[in-house]
Amino acid sequence: MRRAAGMEDFSAEEEESWYDQQDLEQDLHLAAELGKTLLERNKELEGSLQQMYSTNEEQVQEIEYLTKQLDTLRHVNEQHAKVYEQLDLTARDLELTNHRLVLESKAAQQKIHGLTETIERLQAQVEELQAQVEQLRGLEQLRVLREKRERRRTIHTFPCLKELCTSPRCKDAFRLHSSSLELGPRPLEQENERLQTLVGALRSQVSQERQRKERAEREYTAVLQEYSELERQLCEMEACRLRVQELEAELLELQQMKQAKTYLLGPDDHLAEALLAPLTQAPEADDPQPGRGDDLGAQDGVSSPAASPGHVVRKSCSDTALNAIVAKDPASRHAGNLTLHANSVRKRGMSILREVDEQYHALLEKYEELLSKCRQHGAGVRHAGVQTSRPISRDSSWRDLRGGEEGQGEVKAGEKSLSQHVEAVDKRLEQSQPEYKALFKEIFSRIQKTKADINATKVKTHSSK
């Protein structure tokens, strides 16, 4: 009787399923909650990504505008630099010309001063010579009058001299003597005329020098005005250069902001970790049965990915996660072509979202397939138990032994077929599976490990009994 009672207990324990139906339903419920959370998070990320795209496009347009403006300012600056060089050369030429004109003006003034002194000295000499000429003329007239008086006196005193004076030979002698007296003052008059012509030439030369001096002074004032204008233009160019430097600084800041924004959509694994960080901990936050979740975690030991040191995940919003990524290594990025980079980032971000959506649908399909398999397997086990219990109801010991063997064989066959099916589905999904999708595979591996541990504990308990 004791043996029969032990066989009945053994057969009852062996007829139990290889898995706990409640644990399986809880795992499927967690998978469904995970899919729902993934879909909601996908929508949130899509909205934030679209907003980021719009902000990125605006910044790209602003940077392009500032780049064009900077190129224009650089071109203007180059033209201004060329103008500066030309103005410097012109200023140097004008300074040299001004210096030369100053030297010429000084030389002309010295020459004018010397010529003025020469003119004054010549005028004094001319006046002296004129006085001497007047004096000589007066002396000559006195001498002629004196000779005439003496001649008259001698004619009246000596009658014979009258004949001599009236003779043709004497007339010719008197004519020659008078002509010699008349030719005497001629060289002085010629010298006076020559000096007067020289004075006139010197006066004309002085007037020409004065005209040249006035022209040089006018040129000097024009050069000074042009130099002041060049200084004013130089001040304006300096202000333009400072403005160009300010615009370059603003452009550099915008480029740094652009690098930070483009780094958010980089192809590194940090982006996948940051995007999946809130999703991996969503079941923990939304678990409706915290007591059972803790028990399950205690059974798994290291069943959660957050418990491993290589997958440390913090629950945070997308902005803080992305800011953490940017703060991690902002200097390792460099800005390339902004427009092409923005387009590639947009395509890559949309591909990530599409892959997440596809993986979610694949997860739903896998969940439905597993659920249908489990239901079919449970229905088949119950149906087989009913069919085998009817013809062998007469011998209870045989029924218990046969039922235990068939139940264990069916459990093993169902587990083997389920694992094969899961492996086939995993292989099919791994063909286009990115790195961050390993999370889903790890979740199902944890579920299978939990089931295997439960079965092992059941086998151990049965064997111990």
UniProtKB/Swiss-Prot annotation:
Keywords in alphabetical order: Coiled coil, Phosphoprotein
Protein origin, superkingdom: Eukaryota
GO process annotations (BP): Golgi to secretory granule transport; vesicle transport along microtubule
Single Gene Ontology MF annotation: identical protein binding
Location of Phosphoserine modifications: 308, 318, 344
Biased composition (Basic and acidic residues): 392-405
Coiled coil, from the record: 38-143, 188-265, 350-377
GO CC annotation: cytoplasm
Membership in a protein family: Belongs to the CDR2 family.
Database matches in PANTHER family: CENTROCORTIN FAMILY MEMBER, CEREBELLAR DEGENERATION-RELATED PROTEIN 2-LIKE
Name used for this protein in its record: Cerebellar degeneration-related protein 2-like
